């Protein structure tokens, strides 16, 4: 029986994996994609203390290596079900069922896409989902903000300090 299964190998999951395995726990981490989560689609990270501007995938790989450096294991695949039996949990995948004392869910977020042609290819190359993260790359340029509710307004207000807002649109009307 494992001590901990972590579902999600983005920055939060990898950090938890590092700390838990370093503390001597028997840890298994799952993800259905490459470790690193959103870092893998971030062209450049400029706002991480202690690092010079670095490509997101490079940081993701370094985090992955660190997370596994104390003996944790990684499995690729989708978790289909979690069953709680009180003293232990079962984590069910297509390949196998695992028993563990604890489960940590660190699956992150997924932005709602606009269904534009080639949208996936343009993420990190013109399409961004984080004004604070990527706004400085577009300083003094005209940008569009498309979103819903308060978050779109907050992003637009922040970007207005750096960029010219050519268009701000609520997703429901796009």
Show where each model-derived region lies.
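FAD-binding core/adjacent interface of flavoenzyme oxidoreductases
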Residues: 1-7, 23, 74-141
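Rossmann-like dinucleotide/flavin-binding elements
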Residues: 1-2, 6-32, 123, 129-171
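Alpha-helical scaffold segments in soluble metabolic enzymes
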Residues: 19, 62, 66, 102, ...
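A short local structural element in Rossmann-fold oxidoreductases
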Residues: 39-40, 115
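N-terminal Rossmann-like dinucleotide/flavin-binding domain of flavoprotein oxidoreductases
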Residues: 40-97
């Amino acid at each position: 029986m494992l001590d901990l299964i972590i579902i999600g190998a983005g920055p939060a999951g990898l950090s938890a994996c590092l700390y838990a395995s370093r503390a001597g726990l028997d840890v298994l981490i799952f993800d259905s994609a490459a470790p690193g989560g959103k870092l893998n689609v971030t062209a450049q990270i400029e706002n991480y203390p202690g690092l010079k501007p670095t490509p997101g995938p490079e940081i993701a790989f370094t985090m992955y290596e660190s997370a596994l450096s104390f003996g944790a294991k990684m499995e690729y695949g989708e978790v289909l079900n979690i069953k709680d039996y009180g003293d232990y949990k079962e984590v069910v995948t297509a390949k196998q069922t695992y028993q563990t004392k604890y489960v940590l869910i660190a699956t992150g977020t997924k932005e709602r896409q606009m269904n534009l042609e080639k949208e996936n290819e343009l993420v990190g190359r013109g399409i961004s989902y984080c004004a604070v993260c990527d706004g400085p790359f577009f300083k003094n340029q005209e940008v569009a903000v498309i979103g819903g509710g308060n978050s779109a307004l907050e992003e637009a207000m922040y970007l207005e300090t750096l960029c010219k807002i050519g268009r701000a649109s609520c997703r429901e009307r796009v």
